[in-house]
From Swiss-Prot:
Family named by the database record: Belongs to the universal ribosomal protein uS10 family.
NCBIfam families: PRK00596.1, rpsJ_bact
GO process terms (BP): translation
Name assigned to this protein: Small ribosomal subunit protein uS10
Organism: Geobacter metallireducens (strain ATCC 53774 / DSM 7210 / GS-15)
Amino acid sequence: MPSQKIRIRLKAFDHKLLDQSVGEIVDTAKRTGARVAGPIPLPTIINKYCVLRGPHVDKKSREQFEIRTHKRLIDILDPTQQTVDALMKLDLSAGVDVEIKL
């Protein structure tokens, strides 16, 4: 599969778990002889939610929650068939969302 590129995009709420998964992917790709570009940190998405503390009155009393979505991008350049097989067999954590584009 010469002159191709695999683009892997990872998302997670926990950045430590995300970096661990990125490290596993990069090590697997380098071990099989492919060139790796990245990991590239993409902007973190912050969703903020504001809710009332009490169920009835007192609108001035509110509570704010936020959830951060961390993202990373990895490009695998010149992947071999061994690289694709190793990536398919790789078992990542449950809290990491993986999108792969060929």
